[in-house]
């Protein structure tokens, strides 16, 4: 089943005509192994797991056993959505394996049943992930013919030297060109970034952040590099040629990137890999900043930084007024310590106070002469310092 050019390619002639991303989403994921990747990236172990099928079967027109059959796709969709539709925006997602780089016959085999479900109203969208150098105009048109309207690109970095060291096989300009072509077709664009690759510096990370901001994708995912067993990066790590990010470094990088991109109107939909039983148990993980609640740690850091910035301003205010003889007390040597009340929606408790109250512990120990209270009793985040009230 194919869509007409008018029904799909012309869905949204201008990107601003697209409806807003729905808040409630339901993804129906299918993982495509290392079938379309022409490169063996330094951080990826799929080539050693998939072995000959991944590397040799691209010349075959037979559907490899690692791809879902049409019946598998149909059954999985039914399993997710159940007997009746909900208010969720259901989207089939083909992840991994550089989807648009696998043979067209294979793409068609898995896209056709998904597109049929789209036409029947069972699902609301189809997306895939791929490489920037596998998105020529003909590749994009083919995806559109089968109802794909969201494409996620594995960018990883916008520094050519870092991309070369990671053996990505594409460069910065490939990313810029691919995003431009997708925008011409009115598609929704997601970019995946991997802080912590070999050769990265703070300067190169900031330059990547600026380059991504200039591209104005619809959303971004942030995946700090993990050193996985059976990868070139693991070999380099054991040889002392690569140093993995610490958890604190990765959290700080994630907080910076999320703050920067969200300020530019770019949605960051994920920070950190999805927790799995294997990663939680440390199986296959050699080194790197893995945490099952990494995204929550990033939010903790962002709120800690905001509160810290406020405290810096408050202390400066108290100091100036004391120097001007207005009698405002400083933090130290208070006869009656200032009360600091942090109020927030109850649903934001773990973000504001931090996991295991880490933020509360930090501020109470850093400013012991203030009386701190933390309560999930507000409709927004406010901080009352004495008689002063600040809205964050």
Please provide the spans of the model-predicted regions.
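Short glycine-enriched loops at secondary-structure junctions
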Residues: 33-37, 223-228, 274
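Short acidic/His/Gly/Ser-rich catalytic and metal-binding motifs that mark active-site loops
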Residues: 39-41, 228-234, 279-281
């Amino acid at each position: 089943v194919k869509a007409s050019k008018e029904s799909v390619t012309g869905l949204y002639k201008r990107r601003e005509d697209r409806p807003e991303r729905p808040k409630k989403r339901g993804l129906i994921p299918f993982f495509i192994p290392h079938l379309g990747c022409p490169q063996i990236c330094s951080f990826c172990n799929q080539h050693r797991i998939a072995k000959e099928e991944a590397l040799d079967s691209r010349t075959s027109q037979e559907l490899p056993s690692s791809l879902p059959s049409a019946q598998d796709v149909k059954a999985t969709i039914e399993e997710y959505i159940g007997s009746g539709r909900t208010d969720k925006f259901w989207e089939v997602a083909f992840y991994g394996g550089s989807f648009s780089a696998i043979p067209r016959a294979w793409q068609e085999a898995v896209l056709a049943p998904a597109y049929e479900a789209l036409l029947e109203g069972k699902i609301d969208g189809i997306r895939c992930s791929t490489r920037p150098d596998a998105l020529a105009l003909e590749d994009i048109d083919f995806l559109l013919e089968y109802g794909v309207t969201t494409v996620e690109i594995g960018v990883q970095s916008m520094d050519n030297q870092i991309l070369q060291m990671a053996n990505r096989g594409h460069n910065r300009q490939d990313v810029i060109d691919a995003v431009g072509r997708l925008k011409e077709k009115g598609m929704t664009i997601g970019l995946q970034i991997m802080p912590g690759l070999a050769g990265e510096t703070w300067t190169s990370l900031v330059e990547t952040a600026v380059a991504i901001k200039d591209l104005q994708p619809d959303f971004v995912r942030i995946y700090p590099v993990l050193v996985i067993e059976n990868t070139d990066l693991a070999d380099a790590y054991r040889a002392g040629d690569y140093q993995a990010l610490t958890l604190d470094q990765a959290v700080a990088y994630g907080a910076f990137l999320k703050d920067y991109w969200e300020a530019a109107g770019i949605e960051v939909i994920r920070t950190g890999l999805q927790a799995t039983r294997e990663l939680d148990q440390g199986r296959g993980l050699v080194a790197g900043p893995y945490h099952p609640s990494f995204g929550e740690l990033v939010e903790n850091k962002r709120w800690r930084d905001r509160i810290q910035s406020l405290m810096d301003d408050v202390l400066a205010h108290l100091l100036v007024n004391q120097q001007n003889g207005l009698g405002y007390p400083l933090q130290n040597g208070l006869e009656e310590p200032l009360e600091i009340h942090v109020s927030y929606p109850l649903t934001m408790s773990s973000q504001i106070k931090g996991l295991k109250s880490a933020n509360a512990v930090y501020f109470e120990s850093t400013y012991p002469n203030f009386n701190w209270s933390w309560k999930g009793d507000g409709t927004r985040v406010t901080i009352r310092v004495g008689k002063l009230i600040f809205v964050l």
